[in-house]
Amino acid sequence: MCGIFAYLNYHVPRTRREILETLIKGLQRLEYRGYDSAGVGFDGGNDKDWEANACKIQLIKKKGKVKALDEEVHKQQDMDLDIEFDVHLGIAHTRWATHGEPSPVNSHPQRSDKNNEFIVIHNGIITNYKDLKKFLESKGYDFESETDTETIAKLVKYMYDNRESQDTSFTTLVERVIQQLEGAFALVFKSVHFPGQAVGTRRGSPLLIGVRSEHKLSTDHIPILYRTARTQIGSKFTRWGSQGERGKDKKGSCNLSRVDSTTCLFPVEEKAVEYYFASDASAVIEHTNRVIFLEDDDVAAVVDGRLSIHRIKRTAGDHPGRAVQTLQMELQQIMKGNFSSFMQKEIFEQPESVVNTMRGRVNFDDYTVNLGGLKDHIKEIQRCRRLILIACGTSYHAGVATRQVLEELTELPVMVELASDFLDRNTPVFRDDVCFFLSQSGETADTLMGLRYCKERGALTVGITNTVGSSISRETDCGVHINAGPEIGVASTKAYTSQFVSLVMFALMMCDDRISMQERRKEIMLGLKRLPDLIKEVLSMDDEIQKLATELYHQKSVLIMGRGYHYATCLEGALKIKEITYMHSEGILAGELKHGPLALVDKLMPVIMIIMRDHTYAKCQNALQQVVARQGRPVVICDKEDTETIKNTKRTIKVPHSVDCLQGILSVIPLQLLAFHLAVLRGYDVDFPRNLAKSVTVE
C-alpha cells in the first residue's frame, strides 16, 4: 500500500538538491506498491549552518504521480538547492487513500501543527484514531486533514508538550505514542526539536533500514535495548538495559563506554554514515545491500549517527538482536530494460524465474527434490492429517492450481482458503494440521493475520514468499523462498508461476519414499525439466495474442471457462484482465455452465475456453458444444497436438504439451499476455492500475 522512504546523512555532506533527488528516487522505486499522492519533508531555510536550517521543516505534497511532486519541488522559488548539509534527515511518502480523499492536505508527511514541529509518515491504519482525535481536540489541538495519521503527529506533540523533563528523548516520546495506538503501522518521525535524529517503528506493516558507510561498522548484530521500568507519561526516569547493561544516557544517545559500545551500530573509524528507512528493499538496493529488518514493536533510533533498537517490554520468544543482512538483489533486476513496462518484462522473465525457483532444489539426474527450508520439518509435515493453503488474490489461485496434484501425491485432504474468509469463519484448525501461507510480498495483512490465528492453535506453519525478511517468512516455522526475483508490476505474473512450481516441488518431496508414486514423480520431474523451454515457446506467440487483443479491446466483458487443473487458470486469467484492463471478466468452472453462466452466452459475448488433453477433455468438449450451440464464438486455448479441437474450432491458441499438472503454467501465459495487450490498447498504465496496490498491508 503506502510507501515509506527516509534518508539520513551524517557527516556525509549532501546538497539539498542531492537529498531531494535521493528522496524522489526512493519514492519512484516504491511506485509499484500503488498510491494516489506523494509528499516530502526536509529542512527548510537557506542558512549555511545546517543546524539553523534544521529548525525549519518544509513540506511539499502533491496529488498524483511522483513525477508531479518532483516538478512541484523544482517550482519552489525561495529554496536554495545548492545549500550543503553535513547532517540532514529527509522523509518521503507515497499515499494510498484510506481515510480522506487524495489531496495535498491529506498526503503525508502529516504535521503536528502549523510550525511543523513534528512530522510523520505512516503505512497502515490506526483503528482507534477517532478516540485519540477526540482526546486531542479536548486538549486544544486543531486538525486540518481527514487522516488517521494526523492524530499520530498531534499525539507526539502532546507528549512533547507534557514531557516531565527537558532531557526526554525523541525515542521516549515515540514509545509513549505507540503505546496508545491500535491497528497496523510503520512510522518514521522527524522533528525540529531533535535535529539530525530519526525514529522509526513498526507493528503489522513492513519497515527496514539500509546502512551505508565506507568504514567498518561496529557490529553486524544490534542488541535489543529493553526498558527496565515501564515508561509512564509523567514518569521521572527512563532506564534502558541490554542483557543487564544500561545502554542509553539521559539524552537518548548511545553511551559508548567499554561495556556499552556494542549496543549501537556506527562506523568504527570515522563518523560518516548514511541510513535509509524504507517499506521494502527495492528503494534502498541502489544505495546499499546492508539492511536491518525491523520486527513488530521495534523502535529504531538514529542519534548522533548511531543506530540503536529498542523495545518497551520483553516477551517470550523475542530474539535478542537484529542482524545486519546482505541483500542479494541487484539494481538491474528492478529496472525495465528494453521492455515497455515492468509487467511485460516480468511475463518474459518466466523461463528464467522458474529455473531460479528450481535451482539447487531439483536434481534431474536422480529425481530428488530438496527444499532446504522444509528439511527440518518434513517428517512432521508427512505425519499431518490435513494441508490448508491460505492466501489472497493471485497467490490463492496458485493454491487452487496445485490442490489436485497435492491431493494426489500426498494423499491428504487439501483445503485452499481465501485468508479474509478463513478469518471471518473462525475456521477450526488443529495441532495436526499444516498451514501454508502464500504471499508474493510476505506482508499481505489478511494472510499474516491468518498465520497468527493458526499459530495460536498450534498448527505447523509454512511460508511460501518471494521476499526475504518479510513478516510471513520470519513468523512461520519453516518455508520456501520462491526466488522469482523482484516483481514490480501490480498484476502478479512470474510470482504466480514460481509459487505454482514451488508447491509442485513440495508435493514431489512429500512422496519421495512411496514406491507406488515413483513413475508419476518421474513424469512430473521430466515435465519440470522441459518447462523453461516450453514457456519460451508460448512467449513466442506474443504477436498472435496481440492480434487477438485488437479484436477484443473494445468489448466490455469476457468469460473464461475451463475445469480440472485449468479452473485456477480461468480465475487467474480473469483477474489479470480485471486488474489492468478494467473490463469485466469472469472465470467460470465449465462444469457449472448449465447452472447459470450459459445464460450469458450469445454471439456478442467474448468467450475463451481452455481445453487440454487430460482427464476432463471429454467434458470440456461437451461444454464447447454447448457454447457453440448458443451462437457463441469461443477462442480455445488448446494443446497444439489436439487436432480434433483445432479442426472443429474457428479460433485457437495452440500451446505446447506438458504433463497435466504443469499444463496450467503454459495455459495461463497467453492470458497474461492478452491482459497486457488489452490494457495497452485501451490506453491504461499497465504497471499501476487504478485503485490497486502491489502489497496489501491493511485488512
Curated annotation (Swiss-Prot):
It catalyses: D-fructose 6-phosphate + L-glutamine = D-glucosamine 6-phosphate + L-glutamate. The modification Phosphoserine is found at S103, S261. Isoform 1 is predominantly expressed in skeletal muscle. Not expressed in brain. Seems to be selectively expressed in striated muscle. Pathway: Nucleotide-sugar biosynthesis; UDP-N-acetyl-alpha-D-glucosamine biosynthesis; alpha-D-glucosamine 6-phosphate from D-fructose 6-phosphate: step 1/1. Residues 2-305 form the Glutamine amidotransferase type-2 domain. It comes from the Eukaryota. Signal peptide: none annotated. InterPro entries: GATase_2_dom, GFAT, GFAT_N, GlmS/AgaS_SIS, GlmS/FrlB_SIS, Ntn_hydrolases_N, SIS_dom, SIS_dom_sf. The keyword Cell membrane does not apply. Residues 313-680 are annotated as: Isomerase. Residues 377-516, 548-689 form the SIS domain. Its EC number is 2.6.1.16. GO terms for biological process: circadian regulation of gene expression; energy reserve metabolic process; fructose 6-phosphate metabolic process; protein N-linked glycosylation; UDP-N-acetylglucosamine biosynthetic process; UDP-N-acetylglucosamine metabolic process. CDD domains: GFAT, SIS_GlmS_GlmD_1, SIS_GlmS_GlmD_2. One of its GO terms (cellular component) is cytosol. Substrate binds at T394, S395, S439, Q440, S441, T444, H595. The active site is at C2 (for gatase activity). It is linked to Myasthenic syndrome, congenital, 12: A form of congenital myasthenic syndrome, a group of disorders characterized by failure of neuromuscular transmission, including pre-synaptic, synaptic, and post-synaptic disorders that are not of autoimmune origin. Clinical features are easy fatigability and muscle weakness. CMS12 is characterized by onset of proximal muscle weakness in the first decade. Individuals with this condition have a recognizable pattern of weakness of shoulder and pelvic girdle muscles, and sparing of ocular or facial muscles. Controls the flux of glucose into the hexosamine pathway. Most likely involved in regulating the availability of precursors for N- and O-linked glycosylation of proteins. Regulates the circadian expression of clock genes BMAL1 and CRY1. Has a role in fine tuning the metabolic fluctuations of cytosolic UDP-GlcNAc and its effects on hyaluronan synthesis that occur during tissue remodeling. Homotetramer, may also exist as homodimers. PANTHER family: GLUCOSAMINE--FRUCTOSE-6-PHOSPHATE AMINOTRANSFERASE, ISOMERIZING (PTHR10937), GLUTAMINE--FRUCTOSE-6-PHOSPHATE AMINOTRANSFERASE [ISOMERIZING] 1 (PTHR10937:SF12). This is Glutamine--fructose-6-phosphate aminotransferase [isomerizing] 1.
